Amino acid sequence: MGKLYDMLQEDYRIKEGLKTCINCGTCTAICPAAEFYRYDPRKIVDIVQKGNEDEIEALLKSDTIWYCGECMSCLTRCPRKNGPGLVIMALRNLSAKLGYFVESEKGRQLYPLTKIMTGNILKYGYCIYPDTFSWEDHVESGPVWKWHTEHLEDSLERNGANFKGKGPGILRDIPQESLDELQKIFDVTGATERMETIDRYSRMKAEQLGMSMEEYYRHTFEYCSEGHFNDDQA
């Protein structure tokens, strides 16, 4: 076995999610992501189980490990109680740690996701925050969300929110003391270090592609090539 395999074995999710896979394919049959994406959790588990270093490295640099929605349907149906979703989490973790995520289109999307969501959490105390939500970036949310963003204050008031207000209520202003505690949690758990790692490798990739960070952000956020979905042309 190689170095990458050994690093994976240190992850508790591998210990809990990969026990005695018999390659029956039940996980792929039940997987919602496999219905749409070119994604086969059975093959992924088989690659990890074999421990081939080159194949594991290819996985870590691929789009494949980013298709999983982590719903864990696989765990509920596996006759041997394996959890391919847990294996995927371990692969994603190692890919981010080593910087391999920037080698795949879906992996590079870690940058805008981290920038937006963790930025919102640490600055406002919320994953999604009205001031940073742009309907133009999420047109799939439909006309209802378009109307909602155009009439934000009225909509929030009608729903009883306390937007940016003091005291209890939806979207209330989070005290700085609480935000400082969130930052400490990020620091202690390694989340801050992970954010810095993602930022560092993303900047290196942007430089390699000849893009500014804003250009890289927009590209990773908006671009989607063909070949990800089952009905795409090969």
Which residues are covered by each model-predicted region?
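Short N-terminal secondary-structure initiator segments
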Residues: 1-16, 25, 188-199
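Ferredoxin-type iron-sulfur electron-transfer modules in oxidoreductases and energy-metabolism complexes
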Residues: 1-12, 36-66, 84-171
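Residue-identity detector for threonine
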Residues: 20, 26-28, 64, 76, ...
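Short, charged low-complexity intrinsically disordered segments located at boundaries
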Residues: 73-80, 117-128, 214-216
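C-terminal, charged low-complexity interaction regions
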Residues: 144-234
